Every structure is written in structure tokens, then in C-alpha cells.
Amino acid sequence: MSGKAIFVVIIAIVLLLLIGSLIGFYFYERRRRQNAPVSPVSPVTPVQPGPPVSPTTCPAYYTIDSSDISGFNMSTINNLATQDDCSQECSKNPNCSWYNYDPNNKVCYLKKTVATPNTTTTFRIRNTGNYDKCTQWAPSINGDIPGFDIKDINNNTEDECKQECIQYDCDWYNYNSDSKACYIKKTQKQNGIVTSFRTGSNS
């Protein structure tokens, strides 16, 4: 065999060895990947809740238009330009439970309940919209507003009195804890006058 033929044979053998090595490496890697453990899935980080939304500011007063609770005046203030001015005057006096305001004559009537032991006057606060989380009842302890009754109920709990108040579309009720007497109340209709109950909120 000539030297050239021997060289060709050697080259062919080398190529076969390289091809064989590549094929062997391919199958080795394939088998290794098939047997490799599956990496665990990283846990999903839960979304952290944001800070709680601050509640809507509750109103300090609840107003009923075209209504009056006559009498019970503790102070009459003239020349108050706006209802807000009247609200501020009521807020200055801890005994002021509600007020009537006459916007035409700019007169503010600050009101207080009649001191009566074991009797609570509770104003109904009809909140709507953004104020649905605010208080719906504003009690005035040991105080009464005689008159304005639309229904009287005996031998009831105060919770039952409250439900009767809602049923009869009341504006407030008086409840005597000794006699268990419940008096459902409503303002008088009076055009041009507003009645505004103090809710107990500080806004």
C-alpha cells in the first residue's frame, strides 16, 4: 500500500473516531438531561395589600330642609350670613344639641334638650353615599324634647324603639329607660327653615 493510501486510511479512521465521539457525547448529554431532577418552581410572592383607605369624613351635622323644632331655644343669634356660621356657633357650646337656621332672615336658633333623668333623645342621621359608614344615631343622654310625637310605644327595649322609629320614618325618638316608654318624633314642616342635628362627629 502506498504512502498516500495509508494517509487516507488514517484520516478516515480519525474522522470515524471523531464522529463516534460526537454521537456518544450527544446521547450522554441527552440521558443526563432526562435524569436530571426538575428544579422546583419558585413560589409566587403574594401581593401585599396597600394601606387601608381612610374613611370618608363624617359630617358634624345632619340637616333636614323645610323643618322646625320650635321652642327649646338656648340662644338666638342674628345676622349670621350662612348655615355654616350657625353650625360653628352650635359647636362652640357643648349644650347645643341642634339648631334651626332661617337663611332668609339670617337668624340662628341654638337649641338644647330639656334635662330629664333616665331619658335619652336620639336623633336619626340619614347618611347616604360616601357617608354610609358614619353613625346613624346621635344620642343626647338625660335629655328630652317633649311634643312632636307621631307614635308612643310602651314596654319596649331601646333597640325596639329604634326599629319603630325607622318604620315610622321618624326624625328622632325619646326613650325612658325606667318606664320602657318610647316616643317616636318628627319635625314640623316649615318652609324656609332648616333643622340641623349634631351628630357627635368632630368634622
UniProtKB/Swiss-Prot annotation:
Domain PAN: 58-128, 134-203
Keyword field contains Signal: yes
Glycosylation sites noted in the Swiss-Prot or TrEMBL record: 73, 95, 118, 155
Leader sequence segment: 1-24
UniProt protein name: Putative PAN domain-containing protein L775
Keyword Signal belongs to the record: yes
Disulfide bonds: 86-108, 90-96, 161-182
Keywords in alphabetical order: Disulfide bond, Glycoprotein, Repeat, Signal
A UniProt-annotated Pfam family: PAN_1
